[in-house]
Regions:
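Serine-hydrolase catalytic machinery in alpha/beta-hydrolase-like enzymes
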Residues: 9-12, 19-103
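The conserved beta1-alpha1 loop
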Residues: 26-30, 139, 165
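Short helix-loop-beta connector
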Residues: 105-108
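Short beta-strand immediately N-terminal to the catalytic nucleophile in serine-hydrolase-like folds
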Residues: 111-114, 138
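Gly/Ala-rich beta-loop-alpha elbow adjacent to hydrolase catalytic centers
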Residues: 113-118, 122
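Aromatic pocket-lining residues of Rossmann-like dinucleotide-binding sites
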Residues: 125-126
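A conserved short beta-strand
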Residues: 131-143
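The feature captures the conserved acid-bearing segment of alpha/beta-hydrolase catalytic domains
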Residues: 141-181
């Protein structure tokens, strides 16, 4: 499967897969994740499902993927609370563009995935809209200040959730991150 780069909005999105796909897989990515993207797509391709995979680059993770503003948990960079803007970019630009360019059916099953803060973004996005058929959150940043209270009051609207959590956070000396355990 050959990957191509497609400019959507002002972002160079990496696209791999087939037109008329049954599944649209969206992954918010950082530069460091692009190196393993080919392997990830190859693993997904082993399923018998037709899919289109789109890696959407995120420049400022702490701002673009955080659902609300929060102080720094480590280092000096806090969280900008711009997840709403990122979700609008997905729903108003990325998804319509991919549906049109790759002739995806109206009922294409859209799965949003991410790792770390992008995993938290995926979980949060599923509380904001019923657009997503599924969510894949790998080691999501559920330690994020206020997340536990938020998720108890805002149910997910997705049909399927894949969630994987590590066990290192609970052993850290950082009290915010240790709350995960």
């Amino acid at each position: 499967m050959t990957a191509q780069t497609m400019q959507i909005g002002n972002r160079p999105c990496r696209i791999c897969g087939e037109a008329y796909a049954e599944y649209l897989l969206l992954q918010m990515t950082g530069e460091h994740e692009l190196q393993s993207m080919d392997h990830e797509v190859a693993m997904i391709a082993q399923s018998s499902r037709n899919f289109l995979f789109a890696a959407i680059p995120v420049e400022s993770w702490n701002d673009a993927l955080s659902p609300w503003e929060a102080p720094a948990v480590w280092g000096k960079q806090g969280f900008g609370g711009k997840a709403g803007d990122t979700l609008r970019f997905l729903t108003e630009q990325v998804i319509p563009t991919l549906k049109q360019q790759f002739r995806l059916p109206e009922n294409v099953k859209i799965i949003l995935g991410g790792y770390s803060l992008a995993g938290l973004f995926a979980l949060w996005a599923s509380t904001q809209t019923d657009l997503f058929y599924g969510i894949a959150a790998a080691s999501p940043s559920v330690w994020f200040p206020g997340w536990m209270e938020f998720e108890q009051q805002h149910p997910m609207q997705t049909q399927r959730v894949y969630l994987s959590l590590g066990d290192k956070e609970e052993r850290t000396k950082n009290t915010v991150m240790a709350a995960v355990g």
